[in-house]
Every structure is written in structure tokens, then in C-alpha cells.
Amino acid sequence: NWKLTVELIERAELTHIFEGKDPNYKEITFFAPPSLSILRYVWDKASGKEQFPGDPDRWRALSEDEKNHPEHLVQALDKDWCREMVLRHVIKGKHLKDEIAFRNRDYEIEAEEQTGGTDFTCESGNKLRAYREKTNYGGVTDAGAIFMYLYSFDAMEMVPLASPDIQPLNGVVHALNYNYVLGRI
């Protein structure tokens, strides 16, 4: 489900990038957080576990019914925070799964010696390494599925992708897994 992802993009006032209407962003790659990741993040923040990334008065002003409708939760978030969060997931240019290098299995993905993967800098400045890995099948090495992952140098965390290579008109969307924690990229 992408409802809250769209809400986050709209709240950030970045729809022009996703619609291909910005001349600086003719094509983009979007590592898309699913709605569940956004919802979980906002509820955790709103429940007081951590500082809410928006106006606490706007949050408190929401009725209980509004708090149960996720689109209202996103509207309570700070626009600049939403912009930063969306841009942490955007790279200029279209980068398909098949263009991403395989990880060198001799080294951990974050190791200096790692010669595999493809390094990117997102539009907010955070650094990622995208990489593919082959799996074994039926006892045959590398005969199984090929998965794509991200490694965030900022968060020092590996992020699995659920569905790579969704191709809208102006780029590519790589859907992040449902267990992705918003901002850990």
C-alpha cells in the first residue's frame, strides 16, 4: 500500500519530482518506504516513545477519530521533516536492478575492501550502497533467486527490497520491505 507514501510526498511538496515536472529530475530512482513503515514510525513518535517530528500542538489538536486515520497523522508532520525524509530515498537518474553490481562475498558490504555494489548519494546527502546477491538453489551455488539490498552508511544498516524495478514514466521505484524503519536509510 502506497497511500501514506503519497501523503508524505504531498506533505513535502515534492509531487513535481515524482510527476517528472521538474527539469532537474527528468528521471529518478525512488527507494519507496511502504505505508506501514510510515504509519509505524508516526505512531511510535506520537505515542511518546521519541520526539514527534512535527508540531506537537497539531498532533494534540487531532481528535481521536482523526488519529485513527493515517492521512491525518502525516498532515501533522513538519513539512521540512517530510521533505528531508522523502529526499533520503531519492536518487537522480534511473537505476534498474540489473545495473546494480553484485556484492563481493569475500568482504562485508560496508568494508573498505568491498569492490562490489553500486554507491549512491541521495538527494538529502545520505550515502547508500545498492547491491545484488545470488542465492543457492537445490544445492547448486548461485542458481537461485537474485535479491537486491541497500546498505546505509549513515544508519549503518542493511535494508532489503521487496519489489525492485517498478517503472513509472519518469524513473524506477524499488519498494522497500515492510520491516523497513522510516529514516534508517
Where are these regions (language model features)?
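Mature, structured domains of secreted/extracytosolic soluble proteins
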Residues: N1-I185
